[in-house]
Amino acid sequence: MINNLVKTILEQGGSIHPLLIPSEDTNGTGLCNPSIFIDQERIFVNLRHVQYTMYHSENEQKHPSRYGPLSYINPEDDITLRTKNFILELNEDLSIKSSNLTDTTKLDVPPIWEFIGLEDARIVKWDNKWYQTGVRRDTTTNGQGRMELSEIEMSKEGVKEITRWRIPAPGNDDTYCEKNWMPVNDMPYHYVKWTNPTEVVKVDPINKTCESVVLKTQKLNINRDLRGGSSIIKWGDYRIGITHEVDFWYSETEHKDCYYYHRFIIWDKDWNIVKHSDCFNFMTSRVEFSCGLIEHKNDFLITFGFQDNAAYILRIPKGIFENIIGFKTGFNWGELPTELIGIISEEIFQDKLYEKYNEVKEGDIVMDIGANVGAFSYSILDKNPKKIYSIEPSNTLIDTLKSNLQDKAVIINKAISESTGTKNEIEVGVHIYNNEGSQYETITFKDLIKENKIKKIDFLKIDCEGGEYDVFNNENKDWILKNIRYITGEWHLWGTPDSLNKFKHFRDIYLTEFTDYKVFSRDNEDITDRMFDDDYLLNYSHGLTHSAQVLIYIKN
């Protein structure tokens, strides 16, 4: 979990901007849950005003109200939970240029439930029309919620609602509450209704219909429902949004309480989820909510509310955002499976797995054995290494690898093997992605060094599905010990005696030469002190089979 995202962003060069309008417009009650849209460089925000002040007892909750830790403080003459919406235009520095209350009087009817008005409206422009779209619950006596699409007209005279449509749920329209659908900014009249698994609906304001157009079966292993939050925006070849999660419960005094969390979700063009962040809070409050996300020049702007009493814009520089979420939108993943993209992205771009203890430095000579589509090599380009050698045998991956690295690395389309030449089939215990049934070139590590006139390697990253034992063999020992400074990578024990014996041979002729190294299991347990326990290694190898890998970090 990312605790206090705002603090993390501020420490790395981002900024936060409060959204405040005159108190005579609000009578001093809450402002919250803003959304944001940019149209031809003009920045617009929908700011929710609630006719109450919410109180929530935080931390150890030593000071709850008589109504429990969470309560609403209303004006004496109106105890309903009433919402109004203001449209703000912002200056380039995110200060407020203008503020106008949305005039809804043309379409208002007497409410028949206690939650009144359009709640958590997202502002969007579709087909050259401006809309506020959120949930309304005041049209039935039991508070049935439905998303509404309210067209607004913005002029010098102000903001007016000119049409209002209550969107039916897809199918039988018999659900109780539909809310927090996330409008897809670049797809008019489309919403992400559910995230996990993903459901996308298309609404038709002319024929008054709503239908599901995407129904995915992919299910993330997350223990809370992923509910809607921000709008969905394009990000390179992907789409990204912010969801929210809630833990609701009743205390021992039968009072309602909750925790809110948020999460970044990235979809590909076919609505497969390729990456999600850890859950996070904005400023450590239990009650926070985000309705807005937009790309603005070199930044992302996130709008969020704090305890229904304050509204903010968080500005995140794109580079910081990519580091936090661990995903590079300019990186070409080719035809890699969605699940594998998520794994590689998290390991390399987010967790910096191979640089956990020793980092690539400016001027280093780096060798990336098992480069795949180039994620690790790509991730270190901004460190300005002197040279990168990226070795990848798969003919299927090589074009994508070249497109990612171009002339920034020496790309070698060969497999490290016990001999130099050509092979027609995959060796037992060695997996080359999507290369089965085709020829591939092989080269010994010794010949690789000789052909490329490599005198030293500052940083060796190796993950080549069993081929590591053809690097760390008897023949190469002297050169490796004398000329490689940092070694990091994955060693495969699999579940066969041969692989286990190869690992023990590596251990006995290499690890015994190093005094500064660490070994971790795939679930990040430090097992350095178990490496010379043969019974442990036997159980590890045969018990985990295809998960029987270890990560080793060596400082030579």
For each predicted feature, which ranges?
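Beta-propeller domains
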Residues: M1-K328
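Phosphate/nucleotide-binding beta-alpha loop and adjacent structural elements of enzyme active sites
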Residues: I325-N556
